[in-house]
């Protein structure tokens, strides 16, 4: 018997290998080197790996422009414009999250490289999901991402809430993973393959003899993804986990996890199951309505800002799903733009929440934000801009992101769905504006000024720049994601 070694295109794998390599290097150094790896060194390695990934992306984009999209490792990994954009967004998100975590770790007196080892490994899982062209590889990336996050959520062992959140996330996450892999097995039974390209080819050229298997498998896959993006009714873990996790980890969950999950969801529903559009659209229709309305409505009664942002994130996921529902190239580009611009804005928002939370990460009542913009105009003003961008206020990037997903939905015949989403945005405006006005309320005489470390200040500044600059001038990112969509899967 001849052993067939699959062709490996290492340029396609470089980002994933870099993150895995950096994580392993930090782990080995922590275990084998006598002098303890400092938090400065660990942050430096994380940022360096992310910058290397961004550099690789230029070479990957150039290769795709000249040779077209390609697959590698037995067609299980894809290199296309879509994956390049996803990799860059994840790499930038890792840099911003690492900088916030760096200052948080110093404040909480957390030494060593453990946090960054886990963050790098989890990010490698997200990259794997972005580039996956096979259901098994998506599951592998999902598990690598999830396992790292389970530990990160419970990283603050001094707080019982952190351990409780980790246990909840682990139990429900394991349940969702089991549902996903069972769905993959059913799709394999119906089509004879787990490769997304092969599934698409089979469904385009054959009559499905077992449609029940295919529909059941697709539904289970969708449930698995719905859990990861916190779509209603699979969102119940989100508020408790957001509240209990260390705040920098919450920022990772609101950004990097969404990028990986939505990238994989788009590949499965648009690339593999695109011919079954009329089958999965009604399910997604219901999910979007529930996600938009419940996310915005329940956020109204929240006094804890981390729980409020959890429900805000649920509402944002509903808008992102609109582009998926459209099932068109325009919808894919709109979702990609939304995710790419939402990530730095939400990380910057959680950076402010990390600062206001103070030592012990406990001060998360909205009352602690009263008069913040009066005491510290720069910090309060920055948070106001970030909140208005998530609201979708005109002249912010959030406005353009919401506009293009709604336009894609209406073009695909989803006027009623777009109307419900708009109504949910109107509801969400209440809690976003209430929080913003609270920042400028009469100052609390007992409140103290918030210390703003340099690296966290940079992260907040980047979020504000993205919110304003690309709100006024969205063209560069919009053009980039449109080109990436044209190069979506060979």
Across the structure, where does each feature detected by a protein language model lie?
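Alpha-helical transmembrane segments of multi-pass membrane proteins predominantly involved
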Residues: 1-490
């Amino acid at each position: 018997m001849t052993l067939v070694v699959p062709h490996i295109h290492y340029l396609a794998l470089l980002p994933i290998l870099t993150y895995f390599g950096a994580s392993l290097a930090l782990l080995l150094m922590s275990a084998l080197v006598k002098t303890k790896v400092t938090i400065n060194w660990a942050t430096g390695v994380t940022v360096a790996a992310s910058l290397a990934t961004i550099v690789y992306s230029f070479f990957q984009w150039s290769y795709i422009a000249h040779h077209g999209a390609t697959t590698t490792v037995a067609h299980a990994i894809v290199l296309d414009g879509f994956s390049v954009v996803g990799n860059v967004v994840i790499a930038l998100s890792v840099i911003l999250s690492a900088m916030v975590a760096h200052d948080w770790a110093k404040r909480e007196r957390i030494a060593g490289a453990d946090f960054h080892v886990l963050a790098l490994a989890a990010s490698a899982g997200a990259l794997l999901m972005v580039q996956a062209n096979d259901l098994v590889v998506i599951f592998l990336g999902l598990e690598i991402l999830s396992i790292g996050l389970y530990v990160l959520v419970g990283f603050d062992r001094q707080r019982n809430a952190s351990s409780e959140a980790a246990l909840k996330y682990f139990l429900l996450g394991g349940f969702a993973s089991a549902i996903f892999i069972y769905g993959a097995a059913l799709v394999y039974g119906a089509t004879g393959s787990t490769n997304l390209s092969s599934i698409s080819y089979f469904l385009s050229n054959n009559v499905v003899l077992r449609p029940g298997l295919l529909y059941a498998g697709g539904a289970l896959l969708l449930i698995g993804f719905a859990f990861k993006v916190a779509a209603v009714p699979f969102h119940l873990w989100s508020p408790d986990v957001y509240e209990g996790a260390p705040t920098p980890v919450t920022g990772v969950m609101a950004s990097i996890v969404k990028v990986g999950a939505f990238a994989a969801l788009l590949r499965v529903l648009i690339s593999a199951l695109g011919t079954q559009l009329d089958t999965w659209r009604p399910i997604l229709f219901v999910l979007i309505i529930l996600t938009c309305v419940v996310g915005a409505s329940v956020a109204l009664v929240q006094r804890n800002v981390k729980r409020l942002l959890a429900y805000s994130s649920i509402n944002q996921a509903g808008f992102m799903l609109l582009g998926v529902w459209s099932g068109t190239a325009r919808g894919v580009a709109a979702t990609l733009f939304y995710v790419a611009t939402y990530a730095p804005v939400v990380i910057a928002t959680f950076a402010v929440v990390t600062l206001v939370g103070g030592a012990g990460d406990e001060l998360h009542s909205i009352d602690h934000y009263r008069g913040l913009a009066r005491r510290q105009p720069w910090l309060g003003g920055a948070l106001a801009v970030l909140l208005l961008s998530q609201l979708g206020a005109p002249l912010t990037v959030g406005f353009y992101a919401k506009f293009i997903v709604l336009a894609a939905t209406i073009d695909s015949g989803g006027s009623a769905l777009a109307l419900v989403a708009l109504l949910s945005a109107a509801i969400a405006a209440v809690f976003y504006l209430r929080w913003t006005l609270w920042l400028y309320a009469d100052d609390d005489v007992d409140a103290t000024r918030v210390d703003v470390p340099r690296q966290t200040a940079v992260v907040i500044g980047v979020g504000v720049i993205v919110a304003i600059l690309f709100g006024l001038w969205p063209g560069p990112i919009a053009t980039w994601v449109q080109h990436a969509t044209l190069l979506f899967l060979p």
